[in-house]
Amino acid sequence: MTLADDLTRLFEHRSFQDPQPDLDGKVIMVTGGTGSFGQHFVRRVAARYTPKKLIIFSRDELKQYDMQMAFPPSKYPFMRFFIGDVRDAARLEMAMRDVDYVVHAAALKHVPIAEYNPFECIQTNVIGAQNVVTAALRRGVKQVVALSTDKAANPVNLYGASKLASDKIFIAAGNMAGADGTCFCVVRYGNVVGSRGSVVPFFQRLAAEGAAELPITDDRMTRFWITLDQGVDFVLSSLALSRGGEVFVPKIPSMRTVDLARCIAPHLPQRIIGIRPGEKLHEVMVPEDEARSTLDLNDRFVILPSDDPDLRAHFIARGGAPVPEGFVYSSDRNGERLDARALQSLLGISLAA
């Protein structure tokens, strides 16, 4: 059996490509659109759909320039680039004119940076979420999907707490929208292989620079992992599934950080440096307290508002099953683990992408 076979077996029902939304002829806006997710999202949407417009909204002029070079108008005539910050409510509202779908990916997401700059973290992750909701409601956007993180479940750091607050804002926004207004949902997933600032390129850079060792915070530490392609497909399929008020959680494998380091640089020794402030030993995506509101949808879980029995009935009719009382979906209890062969294959696919 080849490495590709191992990975195919592991993700056999986890491509997250079904169902798909109808984005042909639609206007789509991505906040934080110049990041790793945004660029993969553009490629995915361009390959599958013929959108009327795809608006990239971000605050970094250089990244916007680089992305315009990577996506030239001759090949991507539907692309539009807006300089703006989610902290700027007026600019957001201007950018959302005639927009059908918003994918909210803008965030300050690095744990130590958020801890050291708490006011900035709150302004972007919490006030920014409020501004996105307000602009979407005022502009009559059809659907908004907000990207979250496993760190928002039982948070122990400011980044996680700010994303939990953001999640609550988006879920509660449905109450302001009314029955025929904007539909809001949240997607919550783990670490993205190869994304900017993640541990994979960090380990790769150390190995390439001739480091004598790789720093490991704790040899027991585990994390959920997902590829960029899977992340984009999960967002798109959740957009198609959503009726408003859900938190969608993908079923994805876990791995130990020490195994990841060993696959990237098997020749380098590892040095335990201790868990940093705000870090968890293991991550959780469905806490026990949310189990009673959670349904199993085969390739994902959906956490529902406790006050919406009609929404629960809708997903049960689609084959959703309640999870057991006391259920917890955490990286250390996850039954799906990446072994060395599958991990190497996963890294190879990520690097090729």
Predicted regions and their residues:
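Conserved Rossmann-fold NAD(P)-dependent oxidoreductase catalytic core, especially the SDR/UDP-sugar
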Residues: 101-104, 108-112, 116-164, 168, ...
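Conserved S-adenosyl-L-methionine
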Residues: 44-53, 140
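Hydrophobic/aromatic anchor residues within beta-strands of the central parallel beta-sheet
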Residues: 81, 121, 184-187
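Conserved Rossmann-fold cofactor-binding substructure of NAD(P)-dependent oxidoreductases
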Residues: 80-101
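N-terminal Rossmann NAD(P)H-binding glycine-rich loop of SDR-like oxidoreductase domains
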Residues: 26-47
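Strand-loop microenvironment adjacent to phosphate/nucleotide-handling motifs in alpha/beta enzyme folds
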Residues: 1-25, 138, 172-353
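Conserved residues in the N-terminal Rossmann fold of short-chain dehydrogenase/reductase
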Residues: 58, 82-83, 123, 272
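Conserved glycine-rich Rossmann-like NAD(P)H-binding loop of the short-chain dehydrogenase/reductase
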Residues: 49-63
